């Protein structure tokens, strides 16, 4: 019933928008609408092919011209069309040429040529790039073609062929306008693919509009894409367990339009819940983070929606073997725009091979198991973004997101009682940007975020009910002021107030047991940083001051980011940062929350320390034409980590000890691009060790200590319709703790326990996987486009072990049973998407 009302609401909303909103261009006039007015005015009839004229825009309103002959002369002189009188009433309109050639020049606002801009036929995958003079030429075009101009750091331009002809020289001049960030901060415009860029501060940025294809994926999963970067790993194939430079997953902070997300995933971590159709770009920051960002001692991930109001309504619908979705962007008027999207799992109708593979991967070794007939799992997400442009200097944005995952598991005894687990996220945020004058900019943002995890578990012949709950509530207010001394030097300062509450509850009805833990932290932060950037240098130095009231602690966190570029080809950089975070995840017991999502959020207090990190890195990037080599060396120390948050499943899994982690590594990326092929090879060499003095005097390998990891990939662009991608990954096995073979169990007081050997002294076999995707453009007609994508994860269907642990043998207490966590099996997926 809830699903019915939810879908009914969104269907009604879409009908209202489609039926009530009409958007008109204020800078040009539709040729088709104008000639209809001319027909009425002069009592004539035009003959034409609709596809030839429907995209043409005119700079003048020809229906206001006084005579018919002047109108026909204007058409003949200012378009690619020929208007010919057949008789006194009928007029024929036809293209002058079957194939059209255009040329032009691209400039920035200062009149400087833009080199290497992409000039592409919209909806197709071929085009050209602009020369050093900003010049471009395209041939064999039709009058219905639309041409798109793209250059990283600048807003894209979309023009019909008819708008790109000058009656005087046949070469037009176009000016491209910069996006929000400064172009001088962009160092590599095409990093691996044309959808990725690397900024001078080391940030890797994914532009979703340019995203084409990634091996194994049929949808642009933003968090999955991050794993093609060196130093970004997921030891268990889950995006909820992404490790950046060996930091565990809760050490990554994810912001969606300034809103902190505590769980941005579906299927308990297998796929991203952030809809890519409304998200413009994703930024991944490994080191040298700006002082304005808090938390995330290992990385900061920024997901941003578009801040630019669109002139026309756009949207799309799509479906794959996991879910179906839709999105729409509606300009209500020239100042207000509403964007919304939804996605829903489709297993209510049928269980696809993809769903079964994901289900088996997610629920293996849990109370649910792999029997889909006794379970009912579903998920959905909703995104809403409202943009209000008060004037040219002031923009207000309101965002809302809801993420829901529900699982009901029915016991096989025929009873109506069901084990349940619900994982939800709700958040609303507001951001106000103001350009006070040419030198001063201000931003004020705030959000309310809620994360909840709830499970009901029946045991002992349905007589015992265990309820477990974990909840995080967070309110935040942030204000920043940026002062530009000149084009090169700026100073940014600000204040942030965070209030975070964490609840953990366990309730058992028989025997009666109730444990409730509540913690509230108020965090005051002040930050300031100076930034200098020119053609050669990028320098940013700042400091963040934090006060945590619950533990009465203050931290001072310096952040430094320096980069120097020689001749636009060679770059050297050095980065340093200190960071802290007061929330983290722990595992109390492996059967918590049905054994599905065993991690729960906790907060720093008198027993749980504040997590602190220090990281230093140096690197160099060399680029020459279409070749790229990127190198980085890093060293990171983290203190205050909990052993119960490291994912141990051995003799220390239930202990609450705090310790430290050190990680050192080398990251290498090689990339070669051509018009038809994109090739990349990444390699990471790293070592990550833990120290908990209460159990060991020396460091021992961390659970995510993957010493060697390498990825190789190819993207092939066969023609404007067909693209494929294939990649392979191979990495060394992760550590695990074996048992004492001579005596598998021992007595610990009144209990028999597994007799483990040395912690993480053994390693699993090497892991490897091959993924493949193919993308075919089914339809590109007028303003509608349709794509069919097919992808396979684990093409070779390799059955691999991701983790090994031991439990007591239920039939023989002197024996231990080995439990293996297996990788995702051969997983095909198919998607169909239509956009307009």
Where are the model-predicted features located?
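Periplasmic N-terminal accessory/gating domains of Gram-negative outer-membrane beta-barrel systems
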Residues: 76, 129, 135, 153-155, ...
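Predominantly transmembrane beta-strands of Gram-negative outer membrane beta-barrel pores used
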Residues: 253, 281-290, 298-306, 313-365, ...
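Transmembrane beta-barrel wall of Gram-negative outer-membrane proteins
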Residues: 322-346, 363-406, 423-442, 485-491, ...
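Flexible loop and strand-edge segments within Gram-negative outer membrane beta-barrel domains
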Residues: 393-442, 450-474, 514-517
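Outer-membrane beta-barrel signature, preferentially recognizing the C-terminal barrel domain
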Residues: 421-427, 431-435, 470, 519-521, ...
